[in-house]
Amino acid sequence: MASATSTPTIADGNSNKESVATSRSPHTHDLNFELPEEYEMINLIGQGAYGVVCAALHKPSGLKVAVKKIHPFNHPVFCLRTLREIKLLRHFRHENIISILDILPPPSYQELEDVYIVQELMETDLYRVIRSQPLSDDHCQYFTYQILRALKAMHSAGVVHRDLKPSNLLLNANCDLKVADFGLARSTTAQGGNPGFMTEYVATRWYRAPEIMLSFREYSKAIDLWSTGCILAEMLSARPLFPGKDYHSQITLILNILGTPTMDDFSRIKSARARKYIKSLPFTPKVSFKALFPQASPDAIDLLEKLLTFNPDKRITAEEALKHPYVAAYHDASDEPTASPMPPNLVDLYCNKEDLEIPVLKALIFREVNFR
């Protein structure tokens, strides 16, 4: 990936080896990584909702990798997320999207208990970096640019990530950023050409776009741009912009900054319940982003305004944002590739059939794991 300026680095980046991680300790049975002899486990680096990650050495190449061990067979939703992530990450070949290097096949269908996905080893994530050191404006620009570069590829393929947040943005000591965790991704267009309908739960609350909270019906690529705005704000201030404790507090926090929606924006809200709730709130004036982020540059403030626009129809797109002056030092139209369209049926993958029996889903996963 070319850049027009020298890139920032993360101080002591090699000292933090936790990448896809939380601070919880995994259960003992999760620590049993059954790796083929060409891999040597180095150490545990993280735990997620239904899997753990270890650093390992691929002995034939000498390459250090991350091995993600997923146990999806306790719930159909975990199976569907695993299938979706494998299909999507195999589709994308992009510098700012985490790639699958290999999937370790089980000896047989009967012995398929866990799924082992081999990925690039990243040293940390943006969540940890924000909380461990102040970020310069150069850091904020470069990370924002790389997020937008990944979104351009995803959105050109007709894919919405739907769960962008700092912990899903993996980093190395050179500040290379890769978007991870595609388990909640969806197609922007359902079969038949109609906009996709939102499922009830998408995205971690603090990064959810208002159209998700207020039931605008259709979801679009714009929800990822809202999340990007929340992430940029968090990088600039070292704290979340909208840390809502529940649905109502989340809406209140958003409106306390963006102000009461205009009539035009209000008309986009389809849910009668949501419209009634908004009407019940007192009028709130918009707060200046410059007042909220006094140290931020005018370009950073302007991009924030365009990303954190209430109405998704008026929100800046990834392709437009890449041309914004805030990321001009890195923008290179010839090095910001699109991706081939992803068939909607592969992205949405039984999204309305989450009552599928686990044996059926296990067979689909077995077929996907053994696909070469």
Curated annotation (Swiss-Prot):
Comment, domains: The TXY motif contains the threonine and tyrosine residues whose phosphorylation activates the MAP kinases.
Chain positions recorded as ATP binding sites: 45-53, 68
Chief location bin: nucleus
Protein family (similarity comment): Belongs to the protein kinase superfamily. CMGC Ser/Thr protein kinase family. MAP kinase subfamily.
Bias (Polar residues): 1-25
Active site: 163 (proton acceptor)
Organism from which the protein derives: Schizosaccharomyces pombe (strain 972 / ATCC 24843) (Fission yeast)
Pfam families membership: Pkinase
Molecular function via GO: ATP binding; MAP kinase activity; protein serine kinase activity; protein serine/threonine kinase activity
Motif TXY, chain ranges: 199-201
Stated name of the protein: Mitogen-activated protein kinase spk1
EC number: 2.7.11.24
Reactions accelerated catalytically: L-seryl-[protein] + ATP = O-phospho-L-seryl-[protein] + ADP + H(+); L-threonyl-[protein] + ATP = O-phospho-L-threonyl-[protein] + ADP + H(+)
GO CC annotations, alphabetized: cytoplasm; cytosol; mitotic spindle pole body; nucleus
Residues that bear Phosphothreonine: 199
Domain Protein kinase: 39-327
Cofactor annotation: Mg(2+)
Means of activity regulation: Activated by tyrosine and threonine phosphorylation.
Name of encoding gene: spk1
Residues carrying Phosphotyrosine: 201
Gene Ontology BP terms: intracellular signal transduction; pheromone response MAPK cascade; pheromone-dependent signal transduction involved in conjugation with cellular fusion
Function in brief: Involved in mating signal transduction pathway.
